[in-house]
Amino acid sequence: QNLEALNMALNRWIAAKGILPERLEQLVMEEFLPMLPMEPVGKKFAIDRKNKVIILVGQ
């Protein structure tokens, strides 16, 4: 569910700006997302630049 919300925000960002953000925090700073969700224990959110999606990766 958190991943889905992050990817929806990322899609809005890409539609508005035409590029990927450098960092996920930019989605919050520029009000595409109210806040970054908590990451599951032992995982972190990352931008998969090749596929233009946010994924969970091991820390």
Protein language model regions, located:
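Extracellular/periplasmic head regions of type IV pilus-like filament subunits
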Residues: 1-4, 8-59
